[in-house]
Amino acid sequence: MYNFDRKVSPYNVDNMSILEMETSLTTEDRDRLEKYRTYWNFYEGYHWEGLGESDKPQITENYCRRFVDKFVSFELGGGFTISVPFEQEDAEKTETPINDFLDEIWNDNKRDALCIELGQSKSITGDAWVQVRYERPEQIVDPYGEYPDGRIRVEVIPTNIIFPLYDSHDKDKLIQVTVAYPIDVYEKQGKIFTKRTKTKKIFKQVWTEKTVVEYLGNEETKTFPNPYGIIPFVQIKNVPLVGRNVGVSDLEDIIPLNMELNFKKSDISEIIDYHSSPVTIIYGAKVSALEKGANKVWGGLPKDARVQNLEMNSDLGASVGYISQLKTALHEIGCIPEGALGGNQAISNTSGVALQFVNMPLIERTRIKRMNTEEGIRKINKMILLIGLTEELISVPEGVKSKDFFNTEITFTDTLPKDRLIELQQIQLELQLGLESKQGAMRRLNKDNITYLLEEIEQERLEEEAKALELQQKQAVMNAETQMMASAVQSKLGASQTPKLNSGMTNGETPVEQVRKETTGSNGMSNE
């Protein structure tokens, strides 16, 4: 529905614009938007907002961005693969129209970039909202004719413009979703001399299972039925919390520690600046009588005069130690080992088990995050298939149950580095023992298009067997011809003659040479 031109898009809107213009927001929504604004400020490096002006140095070490980027990379950096269970039962023979359709939709919506946006929204705000919608051919700018039947869009909607309403008795049941953001509206004023003035109004789109209503300001502009019977929005929580409809942000516990770290680093910076150009204290003399500058010599001072720089009587060891403790707490509470962010660590031929143990906090956190992401992607796939059926972009294969048609499995790529040779040896052993299938082995190796790859391998195997059979047949023919020639020689020599063996040859001659000798009188090897 975001297909008309606007100066302000739903992707660059500021939370404050909605807070200032929308008076119908609940206290809960206002608090949520304020929290989102704080999270985004810290991610973008604005750590000193709202603290007032100061002459002190403002050192900013943005660990919030580094932590979020690491979480996103570790969880979704390798992407994911989709499989349809009933299509994988006989992967070497069965076609996969549903899997191919889903892969086509995700790839058309830039799957990798979508994963990054999804991960950022989850990690920063605690939630990611994804909308699945259909664009008709007349709504698409398609100069290359790539979408004659329209296209299905999958978009990550900013959480600061989504206002969900849940059932009072079921916190997981979504009964209404409102998308609201300010847009620029041009209005004509005056009867004789008209001019266009630009004002901001809130555009709202209210989705229920039956209808979709659009508002511009307080005026209802459009109402149309919901053709899908579902609310095509999916909420993916970052980390769930019992009793709450929103997820937990990865920055919730990191921000206070990052602020304290910046404060103490700024204090140390101020101390260093102070002692690099210290204050000079003069006792018993006038400053005007002393010449300032480098390589100057002061003489003729009064007897009791004294000049010295203001010095620090204690070192910075305690401050540096406190900062070190803050960084340790930051990594422990943030669930990211210091080495994962590029810290110095001894790297050798580390085993996979040791590497997993070192990164265990990050792995455990990612495992929880992926549980919700996997379930959310499955819901998105169901919506894609339902919209595809409604818009006649796909059909249910004959004999396939509805439950099987909408059922998909999601597999994430393991982002921990592995020894490829050891992994292959382990897979080979499991295949020999019958503990693994070729399809499962390819999934573990992160192969794409497994079905087509298995078909290609099977075709190559059949071709190699055909070539081997042809070679065996040729060899058999050659052996038969040789045997026939040898038999002919034996029959001509007669049973009374006993051939002498020499180096494995009959009378020192090969069967071919013997035939030549019988027919021409010479075996062809003599120079006579």
Question: For each predicted feature, which ranges?
Answer:
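Generic structural signal for hydrophobic core residues of well-folded globular domains
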Residues: 67, 71, 75, 105, ...
